[in-house]
Amino acid sequence: KLHFDPSELPESKQQEVEDQWQSILSKLELPKDKYQLYFRKFDMGANAMALPDGSIIVTDDIVTLMEQDPNALIAVLLHEIGHIEHQHSLKMVAQTTATTMLFAMMFGDINGAGELILGAGTGLLQTAFSRDMEREADEFSHKNLPKFDISPAAFADAMTLLVNSHSASFKSTDDEDAATEDATNKDSNSKIKNSLNHWLQYLST
């Protein structure tokens, strides 16, 4: 299970990122009461995640990692907003619920299905978005970065920082871990390449 603790970031740093967040919402004309940013200490390193209700969690490690490159953090926040705007989390809840109900009807455990459905929300935190969903969120970030006078290459910078951070802490103790790391790096490298292509298009406009 994923474990979150209260943030240990200085209040001044949290306020700095919160100000960035509010600026993003204003620029994109998004409802500030719907989109909430939360800081948490996370035992699995630098990360950010979007929840169905519009909440976005950023870990202490990702804020620290991108402290010297605020544009990279903005690119990540836009990516997470993209997940919410495309309702990816809600779609995953719907898929999980439908699958749960199907199995419940097949095996006659309707009562147990209720508990599983209630657990679907927390399960989202442990389930990766599909590649198509990730691609849509990437595109949302690429498309909106220029609105802040930021090159789409900032997303590539963010992914590079994350890849290097997680590679440094990844413990490849067996073949399965090594395969997982390799697959993660391939996906990340694909994201970086796509982001740089957007950057070239941006320069040509």
Predicted regions and their residues:
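A Zn2+-metalloprotease active-site environment signal
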Residues: 1-205
